[in-house]
Amino acid sequence: MIQQYLHIKAQYPDAFLFFRLGDFYELFFDDAIKAAQELEITLTSRDGGDERVPMCGVPYHSAQGYIEQLIEKGYKVAICEQVEDPKTAKGVVRREVVQLITPGTLMEGKGLTEKENHYLAALTPFADGTYGLAYADLSTGEVRLTLLSSWEEAANELHAVGAREIIVATDSGEEWVRELKERYGAAVSYEDDTSLCDEWNGVIGHVAQEKLRQAAARLLHYLVRTQKRRLDHLQPAELYQVDHYMKMDRHSKLHLELVETVRSKGRKGSLLWLLDETVTAMGGRLLKQWLDRPLIDRREIERRLDFVETLKTSYFERQELRDRLRGVYDIERLVGRVSYGNANARDLVQLKKSLLQVPALRQTVGALPLAEADKLCERLDPCEELVDLLERSIQEQPPLSVKEGNLIKDGYDKQLDRYRDASRNGKAWIAELEAKEREATGIKSLKVGYNRVFGYYIEVTKPNLPLVPEGRYERKQTLANAERFITPELKEKEALILEAEEKSIELEYELFVAIREQVKQYIPRLQTLAKAIAELDVLQSFATISDEYRYVRPQFSTERVLVIQGGRHPVVEKVLGAQMYVPNDCYMNREREMLLITGPNMAGKSTYMRQVALTAVMAQIGCFVPAERAVLPIFDQVFTRIGAADDLSAGQSTFMVEMLEARHAIAHATQNSLILFDEIGRGTSTYDGMALAQAIIEYIHDHIGAKTLFSTHYHELTALERSLPRLSNVHARAIEENGKVVFLHQIADGPADKSYGIHVAELAGLPASLIERARAILAELEKAAGKQEAAAGRMDDGALAEAGLAFQGNEALDVGSKVEREKASRPSAGAAREGVLAEAAFEQLSMFPDLAPAPVEPPLSSKEKKALAALKEINLLEMTPLEALNKLYELQKLLK
């Protein structure tokens, strides 16, 4: 047996081999040592000839949980089953690996999140620098293909897909493989076969492009090799181009917190969390897919909006749909289990219950006053023949196991009915025997029982043994308090009963497998139905949210006009409540392309910028938007740089991250894009940062023309409004009352007059002595406002070069010669721009004036020390404004 194990293990060196021995899966040698550690189970050993062989095992019936633990940690598990009956085997029972479970091929269990896809991806690079990406969710049968023009585009798409496992060729470079593992947190596997098979025509027969066919073939070969069975539920591959959707890189999605928050990386607090009023798992998955890829096709956007508007105003119909959808199980994954051959009777009951909801869904949708409703009704296929089959055949409450009987209804199969009658008649005879023997012996406690070891028996308690007539029974077993007996007649009836039950169970299993095979014929229809239900669920979710929060239908402008009246940040509004949220307007057109936003910290600049972007995203996925009125252009891309999440592990500082993200936006943005830049340049010295910020603003203004919201603390930059005709100043309002700053969270035209930095520090609860010292320093600095600023360090040219920030052709960003370039390229505006920094109303103040010695500060209290320690631990660069405000309240409470 060990030789058999070693032979099979050699074929799967990178996987844990779960080797079936009776009712256990056993692991041996290094697999056992490592599995015992990872699963925290007992490591033992068995005789292996010259030495003891390390061994551990898990029960067959509970193996799924252990397998999921290993898969979750990135391992693979090969399932090796006994493929012949041990009773008839000659020598060692024949065993084979029947499935290789990998991080990307999980089909069931807790490892599958209900409202998330579980993707396996195959990435194929080509000599011309393009990449073919094929990915599939084995649990649902979805397959998608796309061709990407560069590694940067491929990297962004891989992030959007979120694959658990990535398949590449075996000759892929080690450095690239390591980057895939580290960058995406995915397992990496290998497959070299990209040849095509006729059996895949149903999946990729319609794909004409050779590169996509190769990428798909790599994926499909890996699936066939690991799953070792037909995959009839794989759907025809969906081909798409990333240019047909709004583009957002992973940084932009994270900054906007579309599907997860910056701080916790969790779902709660994200836009997905807000929008998800879906009531089916299929709808939840589709919602995330829509959010990952907002549309740019106005006709399709309007189609969705028409549906949402109708459902929003049809309250009772919407509630009826929600009630019916709650009765729909995860049809996509049920179909996957049916195709896989591991669906049980309960799965088929869930499928039947889901189908029983479809007629009511069709009726409700068909009654909606909307032309598109008829098209959706056509896809809501009730599969009446399948419902009839399942209604006639499967018990309403079957057991979990498919090999213990009680699966099939009476009347479905005549032979099964005969077996059951024999078993039931036999059991009735047993009951009659018990009554007869009680009367004959006078022993009221006499009973006829059954166990698997002895079969049927007559049990008499010890006090009643004298009442048993001599020779009436044959003694079989002595217990502490009773004796068990048998009779020839009882054993004869037992044989008849057990034979009938055994044959009944065997026949039930055969009938169930045949029924499951019949269900497979409906897979394409069921998958079409599942997609229709998912779409209906997402649309009703949008309508429910839009109705609850008073969202409005967006209008779209072909003149690049953006008008948002009474706009709100949807997530912040939900958290704070509509009564506490301060709405704001935003107006942009061809003459007002850029908004330069100034104002103090915590006044709402970042929230304002985010809400504009989120309004655009929501509109382009077909949802109503949080505003009183919204007119929007259709954006092809959204770029953001909000906050700073330093990639220290990659040696990238805040400044480097700023420059990389600025470069990405500048290189790819068009006049139809939306750019959000929050305090660009703060990662380096003051003048360098200011110069960079001005240069970036000018470049976007002159060469790109994208709608841009640019927030800054460099008040000097507000003078750019005089030289850049399409730039306008706006500011976040704040006022002082009784020496305290009050943030109004209102955006108004014009530049801000103050930053209120010391007021913010005071709100944070910093020690009073520290605040007074800051005010003294500020007063001295203001006195020295006319003095020339000391050198504050040179710009990090190395970081700029590494970031590859270039504005035109190979022209490098050279702040020292910027004025000369402006004079040469734009003589009409050059003179105005050359003096922006010199003419700015707010000169930078020296941090090192000749100050008098500071007074001796009183010692800090224990509370103040604790608050300071807590303040030092805060990573402000990874906090949202709301989280920062909450932290300030905590510190303030600590100091009171």
Curated annotation (Swiss-Prot):
GN (gene name): mutS
Lineage, top ranks: Bacteria, Bacillati, Bacillota, Bacilli, Bacillales
InterPro entries per the UniProt record, alphabetical: DNA_mismatch_repair_MutS, DNA_mismatch_repair_MutS-lik_N, DNA_mismatch_repair_MutS/MSH, DNA_mismatch_repair_MutS_C, DNA_mismatch_repair_MutS_clamp, DNA_mismatch_repair_MutS_core, DNA_mismatch_repair_MutS_N, DNA_mismatch_repair_MutS_sf
GO MF, any single term: ATP-dependent DNA damage sensor activity
A matching Pfam family: MutS_III
Family matches, as PROSITE patterns: DNA_MISMATCH_REPAIR_2
Recorded GO CC terms: cytosol
GO terms of biological process kind: mismatch repair
Protein name: DNA mismatch repair protein MutS
